[in-house]
A protein has these predicted regions:
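Residues on the lipid-exposed face of transmembrane beta-strands in outer-membrane beta-barrel proteins
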Residues: 26, 36-40, 51, 86-94, ...
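C-terminal beta-signal and adjacent terminal beta-strands/loops
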Residues: 170-230
Length: 230
């Protein structure tokens, strides 16, 4: 849902060249969604295939115009927004409960139809994890590539992240050590505005989230008497 400032006749300066303006004439939006899924299961593996298509009719999305020497970023009911999201989830258990391998490749396709623009964007990605257990020991590793989203004229690019963890669980107490992003020197996410009039990019990055070590210790404390009821 749009914010109150987007629906009001209010203008706010962003910098020397840009202003943000609301639109009190915004109208309601109609949404359509279709889903498809199929699954296969046996003793050693699970396979899930899913797809979702959604269409927003006359969605409220951004647009940029040039007025009085400044770029005005405002909102309007645009023509349409198409989203197609497909993924295949595969779980393999080669050694029963001792080892589980999960792999999920995905594909997203976006078509943003504005009154004065047309933008398309495709996003291929992958999520995966490995969980191994033996007696009291637990090993985990996972990774996620960047997940993108296009709405209006803005592409949002999420984080790419991976981790490795080793833990020991004794029942009443457990300890786990995890390393975040051990195989990269850079952590980042960003936004890109693809307007023809005033495109821009924003990138947030940090080296503090690479090779970050975390230690987690937990205890199960019980007090008082315990009785078993027949």
């Amino acid at each position: 849902a749009p914010s109150l400032s987007a629906m009001s006749d209010v203008e706010q300066g962003m910098d020397a060249y840009q202003v943000r303006r609301g639109n009190p004439n915004l109208k309601s939006v109609t949404y359509f969604t279709n889903r498809f899924s199929v699954s296969y299961r046996n003793k050693w593996m699970n396979v899930d295939l899913s797809a979702r298509y959604s269409y927003d009719d006359k969605p409220i999305m951004e647009e940029t115009i040039f007025e009085n020497g400044k770029f005005v970023r405002t909102y309007a009911n645009q023509k349409g927004l198409h989203r197609l999201m497909c993924q295949t989830s595969i779980q393999v258990r080669p050694f029963k409960e001792y080892l589980s391998i999960n792999m999920t490749p995905f594909f997203n396709r976006y078509i943003s139809q504005g009154n004065a623009y047309l933008h398309t964007h495709s996003n291929w990605g992958f999520r995966g994890s490995i969980v191994g257990m033996y007696k009291h020991w637990v090993f985990m590793a996972d990774m996620n590539t960047s997940y993108h989203d296009l709405e209006g004229e803005t592409i949002t690019k999420g984080e790419s992240i991976h981790s490795i963890a080793l833990g020991y669980n004794k029942g009443k107490w457990a300890v786990q050590m995890m390393v975040m992003n051990p195989f990269t020197d850079d952590y980042h996410q960003g936004r890109e505005n693809v307007s023809k009039l005033a495109p821009n990019k924003q990138l947030a990055f940090s080296k503090d989230f690479t090779r970050m070590v975390m230690l987690n210790v937990s205890f199960n404390l019980s007090f008082g008497k315990q009785k078993q009821m027949a």
